[in-house]
Amino acid sequence: MKDILVVGKIKEGQFPKFMGFMKSDEGIAERRKIADLSKTIGTVTPDQRKVMFKIAVHNMDALHAFLNGSNPVSKPVFDAVMESYEIHELNQL
């Protein structure tokens, strides 16, 4: 497993829709294909325009598909809510 930091920029007013999907049964099922959900840590900026998640990823290809629109489950939601995202690999010093 790799520790990954994902930073996403959310379109204005779309945070509730984003979180609704992430907490839905459908969203959770897709996220389980990517990472160990028990190790996920998330936060959001006060204006709800940026989110940050530290995740323990076991399938990097699935992570990229989830974020870039090639996953058919996440694509409709992410097309509507995401402006951009960054993926960073974390290394322990």
Where are these regions (language model features)?
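Short S/T/G/P-rich N-terminal loop/turn motif that feeds into the first structured element of a domain
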Residues: 1-73, 83-93
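Short, exposed beta-strand-loop hairpins at the edges of beta-sheets
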Residues: 77-79
